[in-house]
Amino acid sequence: MTKVLGITGGIATGKSTVVALFKKAGYPIVDGDIIAREIVAKGQPALAAIVETFGPEIVLTTGELDRKKLGQLIFASPQKRELLNETLKPFLRKEILRQIEEAKKKAALVIVDIPLLYEAHYEAIMDQVAVVYVPEKIQKERLMARNQLTEEEAQQRIASQWPIEMKKERADIVFDNQGTREETEQQVKKWLEEQIGKK
């Protein structure tokens, strides 16, 4: 029986590091960010839905999405960001579910990488949810260093997601990423040994 493990975290908590460790161990990854980009490619139904919602000026002359223009629109307006999310939600969910079913045919464990897993209510389709955790103070420091942000800018980005402590409380598994990469890798290996029987 294939297990479906959803992996989430907060911005700059190290989710990508943990997902990469599962990938290295040979497990298929269903990547929510990649799917979100693919579903709005030229000619896709989700792009047509965006045009219907935001108008034809959101598309370049090539027929592709003008990501810069869309980014400016949704960054300036939380209402427009919410509208975009609502527009894309059914297309995204359908493709994520399709890819999970495909991956389940090939492996004993499928990893589903969704940054806003709890916010978008994907936990119901997972067997378990793992949260990659660091305290908010470290999260903010890492985000400021990684993206060259001021403290205020970093705080704004963190505040746009559920608090990491809240995600930690709801998680079935917590991968603590405060230490070294090696320490995090040991946690992943231990979980794989216990759950999948793979060393």
Swiss-Prot record:
Cell compartments where the protein resides: Cytoplasm
InterPro entries: Depp_CoAkinase, P-loop_NTPase
Catalytic activity line of the entry: 3'-dephospho-CoA + ATP = ADP + CoA + H(+)
Domain DPCK span(s) in chain numbering: 4-199
Molecular function terms from GO: ATP binding; dephospho-CoA kinase activity
Metabolic or biological pathway: Cofactor biosynthesis; coenzyme A biosynthesis; CoA from (R)-pantothenate: step 5/5
GO biological process per UniProt: coenzyme A biosynthetic process
Database matches in Gene3D superfamilies: P-loop containing nucleotide triphosphate hydrolases
Record EC number: 2.7.1.24
Principal subcellular localisation of the protein: cytoplasm
UniProt-listed CDD domains: DPCK
Family to which this protein belongs: Belongs to the CoaE family.
Role: Catalyzes the phosphorylation of the 3'-hydroxyl group of dephosphocoenzyme A to form coenzyme A.
Name of the protein in its database record: Dephospho-CoA kinase
Organism: Enterococcus faecalis (strain ATCC 700802 / V583)
Gene field: coaE
